[in-house]
Amino acid sequence: MYKSLIRPTLFKFDPEEIHYFTFNFLRKFCKIPGATSYLKSKFQVKDARLEREVFGLKFKNPVGLAAGFDKDAKLYNELSSLGFGFIEVGTVTPKPQPGNDKKRLFRLKEDSAIINRMGFNNEGVEATVNRLKSNKNVLIGGNIGKNKATPNEHAVEDYTYSFEALFDYVNYFVVNVSSPNTPNLRELQDKEPLKDLLNTLQKKNEQKKRPKPILLKIAPDLTDEQLMDIIEIVQETKIAGVIATNTTISREGLKSENKNEMGGLSGKPLTKRSTEVIRFLSEKSNKAFPIIGVGGIHTAEDAIEKLEAGASLVQLYTGFIYEGPALIKDINQKILEKGL
């Protein structure tokens, strides 16, 4: 029903406006008595064989929602009822910021893709913390970034501020230095600034009574040499793992009229490359750290490929928009079928 009726209707409207409409609809729907139970019965797959223990955390299933969908932690309780094993909120910055000018979100229907240049629009870390106080036992990742106005030489201060503010309210952290939509942000992926940032966060982490896993989210556009640097940095800084991958700046093979819009490309065109990055990291590191696989998962088979390539968990975003919540159930059922 989603692909034949709901999606064609939603796709007639501006993608950013319909995103907020869907948010409000789901929030109101879940307030109806019995609605949450209905969604759980329709989409959740409960089976002990789906449970995963990764970087010291217990996941009820390995399928999560990637950052960017619930930026301000407004809907994580409702979204979890659709069958996700975990929800990643953000990207969150210390101060609120509006992001880039609209229009900044584009559907590429012929490519089953999206281009976004949102620019870390969010209400700031304090607002996110206040909403996470209402968590009803959802496993939460906190994706953190820097404010646009913060120069790179002071970026560490932004990341540590959000880390401290979110610490008691998330289960793991994601350091986002790979979005193409904040000027010069990707320069923080360079070896020395990245080591400095991660070492600083790890020192803060180690001072806590119970440290939290810190993950690094990387771009799909890194060269093999840069990926080898990532492996070295992860092992040297002793962070918990990697999320592979963020959106791409590549436009290879696109057909849609919006293909030349500036921003990060997500969806099916990213499927192959993100899996290649996962496989490279897994093989070259000899599976030294866990990987969350994300990028172009539109079918259960796409998710299986990432798990077989070396991912411990997977995340959805664009595939969730194009395929609907049934995709979560399909993936979990396929994992059981494959015995993974």
Swiss-Prot record:
Its main location: membrane. It is an enzyme of class 1 (oxidoreductase). FMN binds at residues 67-71, 91, 143, 176, 217, 245, 267, 296, 317-318. Substrate binds at residues 71, 116-120, 176, 181, 246-247. The keyword RNA-binding does not apply. One of its GO terms (molecular function) is dihydroorotate dehydrogenase (quinone) activity. SUPFAM superfamilies: FMN-linked oxidoreductases (SSF51395). It holds the Pfam family DHO_dh. GO terms for cellular component: cytoplasm; plasma membrane. It is a peripheral membrane protein. Catalyzes the conversion of dihydroorotate to orotate with quinone as electron acceptor. Monomer. Belongs to the dihydroorotate dehydrogenase family. Type 2 subfamily. This is Dihydroorotate dehydrogenase (quinone). The lineage of its organism: Bacteria, Pseudomonadati, Bacteroidota, Flavobacteriia, Flavobacteriales.
